[in-house]
């Protein structure tokens, strides 16, 4: 058996990247080999799940090359890994280097529970790369996307991944609001040195909702120096926002520049297949029985926000459990309230409103015309689409005649600047917003 396992390791070492081999393959051991079935012992449940999902085929193929006949592989968890069954937030950190703010990590937000689809594949790949090799390729990693699309899940998955490798990893996961509040409290208590040491001595800093740093000059100043200290020390920084750095109003140029140094990746709305997969995985983890037609019905009703999608599933399961009624589409339909999203404000409604207000046609808006009035109306429409829908920049460009996403980005930035300088633009935006929201309520 040892000869077989050594041969498999030799084959895989030549095929896999060093970080992948060191992280996943090397910690595993061969437990038993009988009747052409190799039992592999893994250090924790997360490793077992990951190996089963991603490397079982490669291990079996390598084993066949070693002994000249097909083999099967199966995975078990080490008996000494009971500690790994506990959520990371319950683990007792090593006294030599206690993690920072580990208690704020949600034990459910792991890579194994993240559903990958076309809408988030790039972000998932980037997050996994950062988790495997922090401080190397994508630093900082900037995740942007609408509310409830998985940014926080991916951020915290990175944290859990690092802690699974080394529980001594010092991690700070914090919202921008909390960072600002802690800064204010540190100033009040004359404890700035403690505050700075807390955030500048971590191995991994993850800061959520960075868009709320807008206009907070002193917070931006302090975060700028924290960013620099960590970056220059080779520590990983992960940032999440509902928009790209260029679209955060009143953000210092030097911060915007640093946020753009690494990789900016956008998470878009999930398609119907991904939404169904999310519900199926949720039902599986929560031991819920939900028929496929019910899954499809809920996934069709909730299209823009994963939190509301999962909330609808929980509400449906609770209802049939309490009422004793069967789990059918007819049973749950009345208790599924309409999603509280901006989905009722459609791209067509925005386009129609702008055309009516500025007296241009939809054909003109989708054309390549650079006439001043048409160009301004088009830019305004792009801005409103970004604000009132969850369309990505490329999707907004497609809605307006196939414009490039950089054109959309420029338009949104220009309107942002105009509304600051020009009260008339600000009043126009307010008027259009009021009409859109009023129409959506009827």
Curated annotation (Swiss-Prot):
Q: Give the start-end ranges of region Domain I, interacts with DnaA modulators.
A: 1-69
Which residues take part in binding ATP? 148, 150-152
Coiled-coil residues are: none
Region described as Domain III, AAA+ region: 104-320
In this chain, the stretch annotated as Domain IV, binds dsDNA covers 321-442
Q: Where is it localised? A: Cytoplasm
UniProt xrefs under SMART domains: AAA, Bac_DnaA_C
| Keywords of this entry | ATP-binding, Cytoplasm, DNA replication, DNA-binding, Lipid-binding, Nucleotide-binding
Q: Name one GO molecular function term.
A: DNA replication origin binding
* BP terms from Gene Ontology: DNA replication; DNA replication initiation; regulation of DNA replication
Q: Name one GO cellular component term.
A: cytoplasm
Domain note for this entry?
A: Domain I is involved in oligomerization and binding regulators, domain II is flexibile and of varying length in different bacteria, domain III forms the AAA+ region, while domain IV binds dsDNA.
Which family is it part of?
A: Belongs to the DnaA family.
The entry describes its oligomerization and partners as: Oligomerizes as a right-handed, spiral filament on DNA at oriC.
Name of protein = Chromosomal replication initiator protein DnaA
Species this protein is from? Gloeobacter violaceus (strain ATCC 29082 / PCC 7421)
């Amino acid at each position: 058996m040892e000869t077989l396992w050594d041969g498999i390791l030799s084959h895989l070492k030549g095929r896999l990247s060093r970080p992948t081999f060191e992280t996943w393959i090397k910690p595993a051991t061969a437990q038993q080999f009988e009747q052409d079935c190799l039992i592999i012992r893994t250090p924790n449940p997360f490793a077992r799940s990951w190996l089963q999902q991603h490397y079982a085929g490669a291990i079996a193929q390598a084993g066949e090359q070693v002994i000249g006949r097909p083999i099967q592989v199966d995975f078990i968890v080490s008996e000494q890994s009971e500690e790994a069954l506990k959520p990371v937030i319950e683990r007792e950190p090593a006294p030599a280097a206690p993690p920072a703010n580990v208690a704020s990590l949600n034990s459910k937000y792991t890579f194994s529970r993240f559903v990958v689809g076309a809408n988030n594949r790039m972000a998932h790949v980037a997050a996994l790369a950062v988790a495997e090799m922090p401080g190397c390729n994508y630093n900082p990693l900037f995740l942007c996307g609408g509310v409830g699309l998985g940014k926080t899940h991916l951020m915290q998955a990175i944290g859990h991944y690092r802690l699974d490798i080394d529980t001594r990893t010092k991690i700070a996961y914090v919202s921008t609001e909390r960072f600002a509040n802690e800064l204010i409290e540190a100033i009040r208590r004359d404890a700035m040195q403690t505050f700075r040491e807390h955030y500048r001595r971590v191995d991994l800093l993850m800061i959520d909702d960075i868009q709320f740093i807008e206009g907070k000059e002193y917070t931006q100043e302090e975060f700028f120096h924290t960013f620099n200290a960590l970056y220059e020390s080779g520590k990983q920084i992960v940032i999440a926002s509902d928009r790209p750095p260029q679209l955060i109003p009143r953000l210092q140029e030097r911060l915007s520049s640093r946020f753009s140094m690494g990789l900016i990746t956008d998470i878009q709305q999930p398609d119907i297949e991904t939404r169904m997969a999310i519900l199926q995985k949720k039902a599986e983890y929560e031991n819920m029985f939900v028929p496929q037609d019910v899954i499809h019905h809920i996934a069709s009703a909730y299209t823009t926000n994963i939190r509301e999608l999962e909330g609808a599933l929980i509400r449906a399961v609770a209802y049939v459990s309490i009422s004793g009624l069967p789990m059918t589409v007819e049973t749950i339909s009345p208790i599924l309230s309409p999603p509280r999203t901006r989905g009722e404000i459609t791209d067509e409604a925005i386009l129609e409103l702008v055309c009516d207000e500025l007296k241009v046609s939809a054909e003109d808006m989708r054309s390549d015309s650079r006439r001043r009035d048409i160009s301004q109306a088009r830019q305004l429409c792009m801005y409103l689409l970004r604000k009132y829908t969850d369309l990505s920049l490329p999707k907004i460009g497609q809605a307006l005649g196939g414009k490039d996403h950089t054109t959309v980005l420029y338009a949104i930035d220009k309107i942002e600047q105009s509304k600051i300088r020009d009260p008339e633009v600000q009043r126009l935006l307010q008027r259009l917003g009021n009409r859109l929201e009023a129409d959506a309520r009827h």
